[in-house]
């Protein structure tokens, strides 16, 4: 039986089953169950009798778990590792000594999460995969109002659903959550889930481009980027975007202060050259964070987000900046005025057509009395859309669910690393780590979001021969999986230096880039069977992300880190 627990004004309210206008001195509570589309919608309404403040909302539903069922767990934000799990697995906590540096990247500060054997957790949606490959699916229809945390209790065969409304105050009737629970085939379920949220994206060919980050990182200047632009024009004239990433500004947070030692002409000349070469210009912004050396931090400290003790909130740690960086309070009026001017400068005055918005999670680290974390995130992105109406938005480092239908593109995995794995960050158990292995796992797991809720950004492929420690087999797999799972695919290479083998792989990308994944089946951990369509024909692919040979039905074996398409 469904059980509901609501903690309001420090009073614990519990009831079982479906309820209509269940009365309590604090108000009326209704849990509705409405049949729809091979399942039902479960929603909770509250009509308060006075001003109320939530501490907790939990709904627990029984689930028919079979031993062979795999459980999909969606990570907290873009970079958070996401995949299907065996029931014997669990998601471990970040190591204690890493928490001062990394805890705010993900969900490590959510105390209600059980991180031990017998429990798994997911955000926004989750599902089990049955032996017949059909899914039992549970997805939020109200993620713009509050984050939804799903916690599986394997032994009890229960799914505990936490609604992130802690500290939220209400005085008028409100729908606390709305969930769609259904069974069926993957492709149809995700189509219906999008339709139930009122999201309909028109077909769009894959968007391509070049970004400065994965070759130069912050070591960019006008000369390097003009040379890269010239090379791109000579080798990939049909690309859409040329995107300037981190490193053009003097400090994170000071978007006005272009580093004139690197860019003596500012960005004006470079942007003009990009446009003259028939590319659209993109720019990187991290609008809701700043580093200590920035003017913003030093002179506008009242804009910074503060915790309950009045201390500035650390959003993370970046050794290539000033170490710890800090979250900004979006609702500071002076900050909003500043951000509006920054957006106008880059999009209207400078003519940038793509805004890569990074570290978005930082805007919603803490709820407010009048806003949940999700509502804060939606307000912030709506603000950017309002003040940059002509620009396409690429979100990165962002909780995904509230951005469905709001942004044009969204990163669906971690940053690609110049090695296969970042062993130190993996040892820290950082699920948001820079990692090629983790990135590929997540982009396959989240393939179903593409062209339904936004266009997927799987991150870059790397085909160059220098400045990385990837094998050619690994490079090939990165390119193939990005091609199949993404709708915005960039690279950072000096393409004129491609080897003959790299050129062949690049031609493969051009040939297959408008493919569409129908399903991904986890054969075993890090070994996948992919069914996809291209030009109305069906194809299969196998991706082996392990260091071992694997057996295939039509081939004798597949090599470590190899992806085969047939």
Q: What is the meaning of each model-derived region?
A:
Residues 1-191:
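N-terminal accessory beta-strand-rich subdomains and adjacent acidic, glycine-rich linkers
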Residues 44, 171, 210, 242, ...:
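Conserved, mostly hydrophobic/aromatic
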Residues 206-210, 215-344, 348, 352-354, ...:
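Aromatic-lined carbohydrate-binding/catalytic grooves of carbohydrate-active enzymes
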Residues 216-220, 249-253, 288-293, 362-366, ...:
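Flexible loop/turn segments at secondary-structure boundaries
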Residues 267-274, 373-391:
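Alpha-helix-loop-beta-strand connector modules within alpha/beta enzyme cores
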Residues 297-337, 382-496:
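Glycan-recognition surfaces
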Residues 478, 482-485, 490, 521-563:
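Carbohydrate-binding surface patches
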Residues 479-522:
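Aromatic- and carboxylate-lined catalytic core of secreted/periplasmic carbohydrate-active enzymes
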